[in-house]
Amino acid sequence: MRVTGLGHASALIETRYGRILTDPWVNPAYFGSWFPFPDNSGLDWDTIGQAEYLYVSHLHRDHFDPEHLAKHISKDTRVLLPAYATTELRDRLEDLGFRHFVETVSDEVHELDGGLQVMVQALTSPTDGPIGDSSLWVSDGQHTVLNQNDARPGALDVFQQLGPVDAYLIQFSGAIWYPMVYELPTRAKQALGEPKRDRQFDRTLRYIDECDARFVFPTAGPPCFLDPDLWEFNDFGDDPGNIFPDQSVFLAWLAEQGHDEGRLLLPGSVSDLALTGAPVTHAIDPASVFGANKPVYLKAMQERRQPEVEAAKATWAHPEIELLPALQEWFHPLLAESTRMAAGINGGIRIVAHDTDRGDIDLLVDFVAREVRLYDGEKVRYEWRTQRAYLEQLVHEHEIDWVNSLFLSCRFSAKRIGPYNEFVYTFFKCLSEERLNYAEGWYEEQDAAVAAETIELDGWEIQRRCPHLKADLTRFGNVDDGKLTCTMHGWKWDLASGRCLTSVGKDIRAARLGEPVPVGAPAEHPAVDTPDERGQHDDEVD
């Protein structure tokens, strides 16, 4: 079995029974902000696209590239389809001309032609990807690959039951807008970015230790930013708070932790798992893209590819769209159906759309009155600003996932009072009736099924499953001075009160050893009016 790197989360897994192409992404994503690093546009995609199988893990645009899929990937390929709660991924692929699908069942092994075995684990909470993220396990009877990309399973036990893993592909770098877009002083952003970066590495190491694979291939990041407006987000090694460290930085850190199984995959790199040590042959000299040469490399890449962004920018403004009535028509039915999310937000979100020539539009999405109206000085906890053209483009395309478009573009600024609120994030990725109803139902089920199982941790008895996304706290829980941190995403709780310090509506059941643990969910606590303790949702949400 051979694994060929194709850039970011994309790889070609070559087995004796056929080839699987994963997450091919080439074109700029998220309002032209993200590009694969290093540049993979020069690969022979027409040949690569003849693979027998295609796996698109989820609908994030750095994994799902519709333009590239339509142009370069054979429509005769068989698509390995995760078992998501909605049909959006299949619908999008069918719109591109794909017709042959392998409908997988999450956590079940499927045997394909000739004996090739695959298993796709689908994660389906509202905060997993755009209503879904997934991992792919592949075995040809001789070697095994686990491609986790940027999925965050609570544990890897389902995969471990299938035997040792030879190659483990896993995300390690940031994929989010936090803390860069927040309206804070530079030093404050650096202070928030450093623990975020540390958590990314620590979380990845926990997965690596749990998987215990023969070889580890850090993938699925980081992107690079070629637009001059976003250039500062690239990591050139001079900012310890930068959340986008590259593969060379992570592999050096991994070696410092005593791990020698790390392997570097660049676009065109090939690792043969059948050879001793799984040596990697590179098509690109790593020294030419990392370290001191990285700024030079990115400047040259910017010269080649920034025209793609400029061409896209020219299409975003839609002066014919009247934003207020358009958003009222779109949002009002959703707000009327939103129960859990509206209660969780319990206030207004201010949205300011700037335009120097045409004038600004200042809007309020009111989750109490369930309406969109012009902002009139109301006190709000949550506020974000962007360009009017970007908001018009979202309306023009009827983009139902603003997280997977504008927010990940980092082409906005934000501020808030108090802690991160998961319901704000979830609402803006659920701007369709189907998505919103799914998310509302998911929250309803979680509240109704509070787990009774508890664990003992550093003098406390605590519910075993994290209230956020059900991570096993025996693996991911750390207690320090009465504060619990779930290192899966960095969420924090005050154990004495059970109060979540990171978001609202996610309290925990806990008591000191020897005292009774609350049977139901703790009483709700009022929202915090002061800045949180920066147990920031690690992925707001990456």
Identify the function of each model-found stretch.
Residues L80-L81, L156-G258:
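Cap/insert and terminal regions of metallo-dependent hydrolase folds
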Residues P82-H143, P245, A252, E261-L265, ...:
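Metallo-beta-lactamase
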Residues S271-R465, D472-F476, L484:
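Feature captures hydrophobic
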Residues S33-L81, Q161-A191, V403, D480-T485:
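Active-site metal-binding motif and surrounding structural segment of the metallo-beta-lactamase
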Residues M1-G42, E433-I455, E540-V541:
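Zn-dependent metallo-beta-lactamase
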Residues G5-R16, H110-D166:
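Catalytic core of the metallo-beta-lactamase
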Residues D65-H68, E445-H525, D529, H537-D542:
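Rieske [2Fe-2S] iron-sulfur-binding domain
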Residues R16-L59, P66-K71, D128, R152-P164, ...:
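Pre-active-site segment of Zn-dependent metallo-hydrolases
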